[in-house]
């Protein structure tokens, strides 16, 4: 009976998630490119591959800065400051195999390029049809591919087919975020239903793909969904009660300036909810597995619950400080600035930038802690009747 109730609840929630996704499905209409991301013609910035040929110190202000070179770079007029002039080979695009020269002042925030470095350079065409180049970013494609490949190989080597299914689940999660969540938020949809629908869809895919379809995983999924709803309510309460606006972050200010129909507090709320997914999933799956393993010993439901909660408390203790330290690590530059600002500890902790991280940690920690008894109770109810049907001598 308990199994039928849990399966029925998961089916009903799944149908509700599907209906919500259809109702909230984004328009995917093309939007204007924000000004900072436009090229001179109003389109997207075009980048090309390049690599550094040489670098030298020379007077700033060369007329050849950024131009496609047909000869040696022109020298700057005398009397200016000193810059680093870097000769770049253009490796893609209409000027492939040509060279350009880029100047850098060498101050804070300026890139430090060495001979052989592979970079991305933006290509601009002015009203007169002349092409110019500027430094855009370092080329990171192959290092990232290498790390991703090693990550995938290690996961599959250790976890085998379950690891492969987990990797597929990660791909599904990113597809949901890119195809549904981000466009829906960009359309101005309400953050809570969008984030809940996206998160629930990710959980169904990730848990069942990685761990298979069983009563054990169904218990973990139902516990995670319950904790996720709790996290959404806590996130809303934290943002409202603490008057968090999200405008202390530069990216949110850019969103407010260039995507006026997007709610910044809604975006903050969605971030809180999505951020709680991973840690909740980890804890609930572990708890459900613990309960079903304890049930194999023939213990009673109460003993199983108590034993699993001992394991769960250890998991909570280790995961909570991991959660807090992860958020503290992401805010480390901000904390460093506050450390030299000669402000009181109370002012620092209640400033919006730090308060957001505190609220995020608190929401995740509360949802994490409460997910343990919820999942343990659900799994204990499911595991003990299942065991008794195979163990007629069990009391």
Language model: regions and residue ranges:
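N-terminal membrane-entry
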Residues: 135-151
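Hydrophobic alpha-helical transmembrane segments of membrane transport and translocation systems
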Residues: 328, 332-395
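Extended, hydrophilic extramembrane loops/domains of integral membrane proteins
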Residues: 105-140
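Pore-lining and gate-forming transmembrane alpha-helices of multi-pass membrane transport proteins
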Residues: 220-228, 257-274, 318, 322, ...
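Transmembrane alpha-helical segments that form the functional core of multipass membrane systems
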Residues: 149-156, 161-254, 262-275
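Hydrophobic secretory-pathway targeting helix
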Residues: 1-45
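Structural detector for short beta-strands of small beta-barrel domains
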Residues: 43-82, 119
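Helical hairpin unit composed of two closely spaced alpha helices linked by a short loop
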Residues: 277, 282-285, 291-342, 346
């Amino acid at each position: 009976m308990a199994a039928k109730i849990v399966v029925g609840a998961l089916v009903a929630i799944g149908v509700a998630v599907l209906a919500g996704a259809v109702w909230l499905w984004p328009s995917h209409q093309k939007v204007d490119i924000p000004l900072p991301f436009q090229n001179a013609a109003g389109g997207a910035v075009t980048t090309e591959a390049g690599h550094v040929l040489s670098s030298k110190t020379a007077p700033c202000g060369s007329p050849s800065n950024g131009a496609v070179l047909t000869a040696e770079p022109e020298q700057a007029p005398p009397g200016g400051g000193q810059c680093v002039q870097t000769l770049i080979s253009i490796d893609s695009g209409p000027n492939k195999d040509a060279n350009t020269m880029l100047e850098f002042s060498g101050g804070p925030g300026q890139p430090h390029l060495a001979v052989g470095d592979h970079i991305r350079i933006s290509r601009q065409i002015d009203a007169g049809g002349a092409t110019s180049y500027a430094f855009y970013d370092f080329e990171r494609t192959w290092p990232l591919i290498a790390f991703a490949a090693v990550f995938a190989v290690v996961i599959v080597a250790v976890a085998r087919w379950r690891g492969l299914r987990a990797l597929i689940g990660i791909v599904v999660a990113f597809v949901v975020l890119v195809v549904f969540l981000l466009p829906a938020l960009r359309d101005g949809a309400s953050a809570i239903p969008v984030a809940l629908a996206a998160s629930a869809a990710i959980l169904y895919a990730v848990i069942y793909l990685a761990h298979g379809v069983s009563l054990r995983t169904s218990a973990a999924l139902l516990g995670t969904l319950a904790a996720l709803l709790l996290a959404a309510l806590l996130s809303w309460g934290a943002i409202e009660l603490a008057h968090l606006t999200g405008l202390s972050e530069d990216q949110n200010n850019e969103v407010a300036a260039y995507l006026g129909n997007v709610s910044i507090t809604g975006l903050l709320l969605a971030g809180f909810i999505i951020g709680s997914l991973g840690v909740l999933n980890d804890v609930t799956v572990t708890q459900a597995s613990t309960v079903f393993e304890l049930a194999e010993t023939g213990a009673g439901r109460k003993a199983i619950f108590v034993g699993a909660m001992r394991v769960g408390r250890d998991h909570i203790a280790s995961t909570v400080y991991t959660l807090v330290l992860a958020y503290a690590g992401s805010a480390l530059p901000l904390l460093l600035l506050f450390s030299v600002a000669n402000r009181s500890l109370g002012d620092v902790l209640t400033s919006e930038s730090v308060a957001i991280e505190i609220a995020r940690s608190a929401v995740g920690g509360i949802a994490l802690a409460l997910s343990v008894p919820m999942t343990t109770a659900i799994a204990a109810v499911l595991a003990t009747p299942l065991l008794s049907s195979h163990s007629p001598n069990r009391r």
